[in-house]
Amino acid sequence: MEFEEQPISSKTVFHGHLIDVEVQQVITPHGNKTQREIVHHAPAIAILALTADNKMILEKQWRAPIAKITLEIPAGKLDQRDDDNALHAAKRELNEETRYEATSLKKISSFYTSVGCMDEYMTLYLATGLKRVSNELPQDQDEQLMLKEITLPQALEMIDQGEIEDAKTIMAIYYWQGMNNRG
């Protein structure tokens, strides 16, 4: 069975600081003409940061697209400082957002965040052996973060209660649960 669509035209309709939006006219495998709206976003990273007493670090912050405060794991997009290196971005974001560095930063997985409309590709890391940084990098001027440390049972309860709704954070928590189940 054929699945691939053939673009016949494309136009960038918005170019922003964080995203670009492209509108494509495509021909489907059945020969139908339709329109696709695609959000282009830089690659990104996220970090499951675990403290020595086995608590995860979360960030409380405002998210304008959903008009509410969220609890999320540290995350950010790759930028020119990272030279397309996701590990470098993870180290940088961990410093900027939490003021920690990790003696171990291990890749867990890479994934597309929302394949129906966006090409953002995120790499999730596990950070352990956390210690306070000696050289603090500048924080993003447009971010207001408050850190919170929680246990795995608290994290699972917060998912059940709808207090944690962010997909990358839920994925990280379930990975953490699996780590504990494997011993």
Regions picked out by a protein language model, each given a short descriptive name:
Residues 1-5, 69, 107, 122-123, ...:
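Nudix hydrolase/Nudix homology domain
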Residues 2, 36, 46, 51, ...:
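Conserved Nudix-box catalytic region and its N-terminal flanking loop in Nudix hydrolases
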Residues 9-46, 51-53:
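Acidic, metal-coordinating catalytic segment for phosphate/diphosphate chemistry
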Residues 11-12, 109-114:
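Short, solvent-exposed loop/turn elements at beta->coil junctions and helix N-caps
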Residues 21-23, 48, 58, 124-126, ...:
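Conserved hydrophobic/aromatic beta-strand scaffold that supports enzyme active sites
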Residues 23-30, 114-134:
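Active-site-adjacent beta-strand/loop module that shapes the phosphate/pyrophosphate-binding cleft
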Residues 29-30, 51-53, 62, 82, ...:
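Short loop segments at secondary-structure junctions
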Residues 101-108:
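A short coil-to-beta-strand element that immediately follows conserved catalytic motifs
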